[in-house]
């Protein structure tokens, strides 16, 4: 058998395998913020679906700790274990985009870490994470923007 036929067969197999996996584990775009039209099962008032290696997950955990909010941490495996839990059948029911973190507050999922930070801060204004002075608020905004990793293009900052 000619080698070009073998090569085309192997390439076709890998392309087809990739397309099948992509179809089986498809994700959907979501908008950030509280999802009033969605609900998720919950056991605790606050449940954070996150990964310890995720920058966005860590900043949400820091905000929850800083505000003194009691929450249940649900570790979602990414690439470090090879299980790719964000592409499993379970996690996309919580967040159809397959991205972490997701905060579930009494059954309502909240997507996008910066939106989660705003939500957390709005819960108790007596101990706000955002400074009162306009200059300090602007400084916080600059840092949030600098540290933002948009889910639409998480690797875009490398360009």
Question: Can you say where each PLM-predicted feature lies in the sequence?
Answer:
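GST-like domain detector, emphasizing the conserved glutathione-binding G-site
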Residues: 2-159
């Amino acid at each position: 058998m000619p080698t070009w036929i073998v090569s085309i067969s192997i390439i076709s197999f890998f392309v087809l395998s990739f397309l099948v996996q992509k179809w089986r584990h498809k994700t959907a775009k979501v908008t950030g913020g509280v999802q009033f039209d969605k609900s998720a099962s919950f056991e605790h008032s606050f449940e954070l679906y996150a990964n310890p290696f995720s920058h966005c997950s860590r900043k949400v955990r820091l905000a929850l700790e800083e505000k003194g909010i009691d929450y249940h941490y649900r570790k979602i495996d990414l690439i470090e274990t090879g299980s790719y839990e964000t592409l499993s059948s379970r996690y996309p029911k919580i967040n159809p985009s397959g991205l972490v973190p997701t905060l579930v507050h009494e059954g309502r999922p909240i997507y996008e870490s910066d939106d989660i930070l705003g939500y957390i801060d709005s819960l108790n204004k007596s101990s706000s994470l955002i400074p009162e002075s306009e200059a300090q608020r602007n400084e916080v905004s600059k840092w949030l923007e600098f540290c933002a990793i948009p889910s639409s293009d998480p690797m875009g900052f490398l360009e």
